[in-house]
Structure formats: C-alpha cells, structure tokens
Amino acid sequence: MTHQTHAYHMVNPSPWPLTGALSALLMTSGLIMWFHFNSVALLMLGLTTNMLTMYQWWRDVIRESTFQGHHTPNVQKGLRYGMILFIISEVLFFTGFFWAFYHSSLAPTPELGGCWPPTGIHPLNPLEVPLLNTSVLLASGVSITWAHHSLMEGNRNHMLQALFITIALGVYFTLLQASEYYEAPFTISDGVYGSTFFVATGFHGLHVIIGSTFLIVCFFRQLKFHFTSSHHFGFEAAAWYWHFVDVVWLFLYVSIYWWGS
C-alpha cells in the first residue's frame, strides 16, 4: 500500500456499481414482464444479480473498514452525511406517493363517484392486521434501540438478542403484509385507490425487506466481533434506516388505512 498523508479513503476501482445498475435494470424490466406477461424469468435473474452484487459489495466494504482500517473518523463523518442525505431523498420519494394519495382523496373526481374510498371499493379494516403491523413495527423500533444501547455499553449478548428480535419482527411484518395483500378485496388495477394503496404500501414493504437484510448483515458481523462501542457505523446506519421505515409506516397507517378508509 502506498503511503498517504491524509485521512481519506481513496477507493479502488470496483465493478459493483455497474453490476448493481444492471441488476436494477433487470429487476424493473422483470417486474413489468411479470405484471404484463406473467413471466418471472427476467425478475429472478435481476434478483439473483442483485443478491450477488450486495454480497460482494458488502464483503469489500467490510474488508476495507474492519480489516484494513480505511474508515477513519473523517471517512465515517462522510458516510454519516451520505446516509442522512440518502434518508432525506427517501423522504422525498415517499412524499410523492402521499401527494398522489391526497390529491386523489381530498377532492374525488366524478369518475370515482365523488367519494373516497371510490364507489365499489371495500377498504381494509384499520383495526385488524394494519394495527397489528403498526404494533410489530413500533416494537421493532424499541428492540433496535435496545440493541444500540447494548452495543454502546459493550454488552454483546444483549445486543445480539435485541437485534435478533428486531429481525424476527421485520420478517413477521413482511409475512403479515403478504397475507394482507393476498386477502385484499381489491387489486392494484382497481383504479386510483388500488394504485396508490399498493404502490405506497408495497414500496414501504420493499424498504422493510431491505432494512431486514441490512440488519441480518449486522447480526452476522456482530457474531464475528466486527463492532465495538466506538466503531459501529454499519449498525448505526441500519438503525437510522429502520427508524425511518417505522416513521413512514405511521404516516401510511394514519393516512391510507385509517383516514382513507
């Protein structure tokens, strides 16, 4: 390694941004093929390349940060700023879905019967599965905070227990959401109600899956003693992301499930 006189990480050339972009193209194209032609081949190819990219990119970052010591305090500060900006961009992303929902529901057009929910739509009961989902995500927010405090105090076993509980609650939420979709009396093609409901809750569900994956990686890293009380930004970023997912769900629940029904 050549000598450097600064605290910043000069990243080596990497193929993973390219393969990540390719997998994103394959997944989005595959989703369209699945919706319109009921073919999942392209979607499966996209998911496979995405999983391989994630595994190898995470492996490289872990090697650079944990084993090569490239993540100095200055680098960590840059990563923190990057994660904050990423979460802000996600807030704006979901703002678009809420905008579409309120644009359609606050002044329903004559085509919708002049009412919301539109004529013929039977909305889900907000006091059944959606309320259980809310409880599950709020509980996971408590357990991820417990994990963070345990890590800061150097209590490895409690951190692992709390992180495992958070992951289990995330998986449980995903299964509940899948069962709700399966039982729903309307589909994504049922006008603007179906579109806004499934796109908003579906993208949130996707973010829960991404967050759960992030936490699973952190769980295995903690098993291998990668985190210390002073050097654990990977876990901190996952916790921030999980709290963001929690807050978005609260807005979804109040807006779409409770008020929108």
From Swiss-Prot:
Mitochondrial matrix topological segments: 1-15, 67-72, 153-155, 224-232
Gene Ontology molecular function: any one: cytochrome-c oxidase activity
Mitochondrial intermembrane-side positions: 35-40, 106-128, 184-190, 257-261
Compartment annotation: Mitochondrion inner membrane
Main location: mitochondrion
Protein keywords: Membrane, Mitochondrion, Mitochondrion inner membrane, Translocase, Transmembrane, Transmembrane helix
Protein's UniProt keywords contain Transmembrane: yes
Gene3D superfamilies: 1.10.287.70, Cytochrome c oxidase, subunit III, four-helix bundle
Coiled-coil region: none
Keyword presence, Protein biosynthesis: no
Subunit annotation: Component of the cytochrome c oxidase (complex IV, CIV), a multisubunit enzyme composed of 14 subunits. The complex is composed of a catalytic core of 3 subunits MT-CO1, MT-CO2 and MT-CO3, encoded in the mitochondrial DNA, and 11 supernumerary subunits COX4I, COX5A, COX5B, COX6A, COX6B, COX6C, COX7A, COX7B, COX7C, COX8 and NDUFA4, which are encoded in the nuclear genome.
Family: Belongs to the cytochrome c oxidase subunit 3 family.
Protein known as: Cytochrome c oxidase subunit 3
Organism this protein belongs to: Nanger granti
